[in-house]
Amino acid sequence: MDPPSLMSDGSSWSKLPLDLLIMVFERLGFVDFQRTKSVCLAWLYASRMSAPNKQIPWLIMFPEKGKDFCLLFNSEEKEKIYRIQNLGVEFANSHCLAIYGSWLFMRDPRYKLYIMNLFTRERINLPSVESQFGRIKIEQINDDLFYRKVDDEYDYHPKRHMIDISDHILWIDDKTKDYVVMWSFECGYTYMVYCRTGDNIWNYRSLDISTVNIVYKDHKMYLYSYTRDVKVLDFCEDIPRQIFETQVNYDILMEKGFRSDVDDVLNDKKEHLVVTLNGDVLRVKSKIWDNSDVWSFCIYKLNSSNTYWEKLTSLGDEAILLDLGITVLANTIEGINRNSIYFSGYHRPHYFRFDHVWSEKDICVFNLDTQEVERPHQSICSSIQISGARWFVPNFKHI
């Protein structure tokens, strides 16, 4: 298809080669990209063949249950918020488990799982959670309560019947719609459950570790365990295979023995795994003191022999999106704070041993240089009641 005729006003900027325009447009942020579309017909045509820079973090905010819209906040525009409306009754009563690009991994009130595109409304239904995994069978007792049977029998201890479905992960290719969806549960060790394009049942792999956090990036699954070890599984083939494992010198019992009573009582903390642009793995510890709304963070990187976590004081020109477990380049992109951590709070309330309730104050950008917290969204969201939020990197190809 040939581009439309160019405007005949003699302006040379309207006659730039299409390849050059596309190259320029793909370097723009969202705001400048939208402005360039209105310059002339040739620029509008070029914009439809490209997309704004994909590495700018946006914040998606979910209102109270029963509302069929969500809110988007762009880091480039400090005083503006976008509303995506009419997302449907099912969306209004669903809960977001994970996000990738412009796709949401959702569960409805009956714990039916699906993924949907925020902008096109395209939806893909996923298999039922009630499944058989070798000797283990998962049964749904009520809306969000699941029991497990081993060899078709319940465990002798009633509380051990219950399983906690966690570590929700989504990856999808916007062009081909190929996807990978994951979640996990514990039964002695971690069972990693996954579904790929074309699957009508859940596949699984039992792991000989108990995981704290899982990240999926570049067709690899990174697992972080309670012993502070990292395993990497390659998902390029039908059956995932292990390609990397650490042997970290860490004694969890010794650390607990030396922990002070004050530290144990006055704060709550969680550890996260992050994979950098060049494939390095980082350990990020987030901590909040009881009766406080101020978060603090520490970052660690494996030493050269992969046996010890060393404290890292700078990310250089990268920034961490903790919700996604990745870093993005921040040195040339307006709207991203370099050497910072983008955080939206804990998404599983049972992490908290105290009465800390999630609020919009948990959404923040932590600057590693100053050790200070910024809440860029707060001035425009103070009057809006939200129930949750996540930082993500949207794909605006279909806008």
Curated annotation (Swiss-Prot):
Taxonomy, superkingdom: Eukaryota
Domain F-box: 12-48
InterPro entries: F-box-like_dom_sf (IPR036047), F-box_BR-signaling (IPR050942), F-box_dom (IPR001810), KIB1-4_b-propeller (IPR005174)
Pfam families found in the cross-reference section: Beta-prop_KIB1-4, F-box
UniProt cross-references to PANTHER family, sorted A to Z: F-BOX DOMAIN-CONTAINING PROTEIN, OS07G0183000 PROTEIN-RELATED
Protein name in the entry: Probable F-box protein At4g22060
